[in-house]
Amino acid sequence: MFLNSLLTNFAALEVGQHLYWQIGNIRLHGQVFLTSWILLGALLVFISLGTKKMENDPKGLQNLLEFLWDYIRDLARTQIGEKVYRDWMPFIGTLFLFVFVSNWGGALIPWRLIKLPSGELGAPTADINTTIALALLVSLSYFYAGLSNKGWRYFEYYVHPTPIMLPFKILEDFTKPLSLSFRLFGNILADELVVGVLVFLVPLILPIPVMFLGLFTSAIQALIFATLAAYYIGEAVEEHH
Amino acid sequence: MLAFNFFGATEGGLFDINATLPLMAIQVVALTYILNSLFFKPVGNVVEKREKFVSNNIIEAKNKLSEVKKLEADLLTQLQSARTEAQRIVSEAEDESDKLYKEALELANNEANASKEKARLEIESQTSAARDQLSKQADDLSELIVNRLILEK
C-alpha cells in the first residue's frame, strides 16, 4: 500500500522515537537532555565570557549581552508594566534565551551526523515534554505573580468586567498552557520535519530556503513565547479600576 | 492512539509524556537562577549604573544651562540699565552744554548789544559835538563875512 510505504519513509526520519534513559522506574528522553545540556552549556560559556570583565565602556561581547539585556528588559517592561517587571525579568529572559537557543541550536547544528542507538538529536523544544514544562512554569508564574501582588483580589480578574466572563476566564487557564506548549512544539517539530523530508527527497539546494525560513520561525517562536509569558504575568498583576 | 500508530513507533511517539517534563521544568528553574546571578544581575547593574550616570550628567548639565541662562538674563538686564544710565548721562550733559551755550550766547549778545549801544551813544554825542562845532564855525564865518562886508562899505 502507498500509505504503508509512506509510513516507512517517515519512519526513516525517526519521528517519535526517543533515546530512553531508565533511572529506577522513571524513563527520560535522553536526546532532549543531551542537546539541552550542550546548548545551555554553550550559552553559559558565552555569557560567562561576556560578563567576565564588565566595564562602564562596553566592548565586544559585553556590548552584545547588554543589547540582549536591554531587549529582554523592554519586552518585560512593556508587557508586565513598570511596577513589577524587575521581579519577572530573569524568568522571561530565561524563557526567551532557552527557547531561542534550543530552536536555533536545533536548526543550525547538524545533529544528524551524531548517531544514537535510538531516536536522534534535535531541538529540545521539538519534544512535547519540554514545551509543556515551559508552559506549566508560565502558568505557575502568573498565578504566583497575581496572588503575591494582589492576594485574594487576584480572583477579581475572573469576574472582570462582568461575572459572565467567569467560565471563559477559567477556560483560559487551561487554554493558555495548552496553546503555549503546542504552538512551540508544533512549529519547531514541523520545521524539523519539513527540512528532514526535503533533505530526504532533494538533498541539494532546495532545503536551504526552508532552512532559512526555519531560522526565522525559530526566532519568532522564542519571541512569541517570551512575549506571551510576560503578557500573562502582566495580565495577572494588572490593577483593575 | 492515532499519533503513536501513524508515526510507526513501537514505543513512545510524539506525545510521549514522562518524567522528562518535571525534570525539564526543574532544569529551567535552575537555569533561571543561574542566569539571574550570571547574566541579569551583573549586566543590569552595569547598565543601570551607566543609565544613572548619564541621567545624572544630563540633570547636572541642565542645571548648569539654566544657571547660565539666568546669569545671561542678569547680565542682559545689567547691560540694559547701564545703557539707559549712559543715555541719561549723555542727554543730561547735552542739556547742560546746551544751557551753557545758550547762557554764553546770551551773555555775549548782551555784551555786544551794550557795547553797540555805547558806541552809538558815543557816535551820537560826537556827531552832535561836531555839528555844534560846525554850526559855531558857520556862525563865526558868517559873522566874519558880515563884518567884512560891513567894513568894506
Swiss-Prot record, chain A:
Alphabetically sorted, this entry's keywords are: ATP synthesis, CF(0), Hydrogen ion transport, Ion transport, Membrane, Thylakoid, Transmembrane, Transmembrane helix, Transport
Q: Where is this gene product found?
A: Cellular thylakoid membrane
Q: What is this protein called?
A: ATP synthase subunit a
Alphabetical list of PANTHER family matching this protein: ATP SYNTHASE SUBUNIT A, CHLOROPLASTIC (PTHR42823:SF3)
- Naturally occurring in which organism (per UniProt): Prochlorococcus marinus (strain MIT 9215)
Its biological purpose: Key component of the proton channel; it plays a direct role in the translocation of protons across the membrane.
**Organism classification:** Bacteria, Bacillati, Cyanobacteriota, Cyanophyceae, Synechococcales
Q: Superkingdom of this entry's organism?
A: Bacteria
Q: How does it assemble?
A: F-type ATPases have 2 components, CF(1) - the catalytic core - and CF(0) - the membrane proton channel. CF(1) has five subunits: alpha(3), beta(3), gamma(1), delta(1), epsilon(1). CF(0) has four main subunits: a, b, b' and c.
Classification via SUPFAM superfamilies: F1F0 ATP synthase subunit A
Q: One GO CC term of this entry? A: proton-transporting ATP synthase complex
Q: Which family does it belong to?
A: Belongs to the ATPase A chain family.
Q: Which Pfam families match?
A: ATP-synt_A (PF00119)
Q: Name one GO molecular function term.
A: proton-transporting ATP synthase activity, rotational mechanism
TM annotation in the entry: 30-50, 91-111, 128-148, 193-213, 214-234
Q: List the cysteine pairs that form cystine.
A: none
Q: Which topology term describes how it sits in the membrane?
A: Multi-pass membrane protein
